[in-house]
């Protein structure tokens, strides 16, 4: 896992039961990509469906990922919340933390994201922390400062396995893609920060998550310190998503 390329598809608020089943069955014919860890982050209501399909149809070749988790650690009067323990019950393996849309629409900041990270780790799941700067922050030359602040929640966590997705907010859903030089700079910076915060013996995966498509995936995977991709809209298409997986396998 920690020496593979990761390709995680984030469905966001998309999916229906019938369409999900059809997609899972199409994956039956896709050849095994031994060098790639594949995951799908579905809406919570579909996690158990995906997990069961992955066991029955795909022999666990694709991991179940959740898009979010509650900041509250235990059961209680938190209407609408889903705890880390509940996600574990669905067979979830990986949990996204701090996606830019959670910050944009729900105002989530470091304190909440830290609590979510701890909850996920406490039940044995893998958190995937999302970090990234806005266009205004990049144009002001503050991208390193912003990312360092977001990564600071990693300090003191009881884990030696750190997964981060760098998602420049200005390149999500806009059709814009950071240059190879920009991606290389930010991923190298993130690696350096993680090692400083967590120690030299930590295992690291840093994914790129800014409008990854079938036609740019190979170039992105060739960038130093890019360990995979967090894929948005392209993960809803079997052909596009499997093309990205193939690019990772061949990187």
From Swiss-Prot:
GO CC aspect terms: cytosol
Keywords: Cytoplasm, Gluconeogenesis, Glycolysis, Isomerase
UniProt xrefs under InterPro entries: Aldolase_TIM (IPR013785), Aspartic_peptidase_AS (IPR001969), TIM_sf (IPR035990), TrioseP_Isoase_bac/euk (IPR022896), Triosephosphate_isomerase (IPR000652), Triosephosphate_isomerase_AS (IPR020861)
Positions annotated to bind substrate: 10-12, 173, 211, 232-233
Family annotation (Pfam families): TIM
Residue stretches spanning the membrane: none
Catalytic activity: D-glyceraldehyde 3-phosphate = dihydroxyacetone phosphate
GO biological process, one term: glycolytic process
Family: Belongs to the triosephosphate isomerase family.
Function recorded in the entry: Involved in the gluconeogenesis. Catalyzes stereospecifically the conversion of dihydroxyacetone phosphate (DHAP) to D-glyceraldehyde-3-phosphate (G3P).
The protein's name in its UniProt record: Triosephosphate isomerase
Organism expressing this protein natively: Neisseria meningitidis serogroup B (strain ATCC BAA-335 / MC58)
């Amino acid at each position: 896992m920690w020496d593979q390329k990761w390709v995680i598809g984030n469905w966001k608020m998309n999916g229906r039961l019938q369409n999900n089943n059809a997609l899972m069955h199409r994956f039956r014919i896709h050849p095994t990509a031994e060098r790639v860890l594949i995951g799908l982050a579905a809406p919570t209501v579909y996690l158990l469906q995906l997990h069961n399909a992955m066991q029955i149809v795909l022999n666990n070749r694709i991991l179940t990922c959740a898009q979010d988790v509650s900041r509250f650690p235990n059961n209680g009067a938190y209407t609408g919340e889903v705890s880390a323990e509940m996600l574990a019950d669905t067979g979830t393996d990986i949990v996204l933390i701090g996606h830019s849309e959670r910050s944009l629409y729900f105002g989530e900041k470091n304190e909440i994201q830290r609590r979510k990270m701890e909850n996920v780790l406490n039940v044995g799941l893998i958190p995937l922390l999302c970090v990234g700067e806005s266009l205004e922050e990049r144009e002001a030359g503050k991208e390193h400062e912003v990312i360092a602040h977001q990564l600071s929640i990693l300090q003191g966590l009881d884990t030696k396995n750190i997964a981060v997705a760098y998602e420049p907010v200005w390149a999500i859903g806009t059709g814009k893609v950071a240059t190879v030089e920009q991606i290389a700079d930010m991923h190298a910076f993130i690696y350096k920060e993680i090692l400083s915060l967590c120690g030299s013996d930590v295992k690291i995966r840093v994914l790129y998550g800014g409008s990854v498509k079938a036609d740019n995936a190979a170039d992105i995977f060739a960038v130093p310190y890019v360990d995979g991709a967090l894929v948005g809209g392209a993960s809803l298409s079997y052909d596009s998503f499997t093309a990205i997986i193939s690019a990772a396998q061949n990187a």
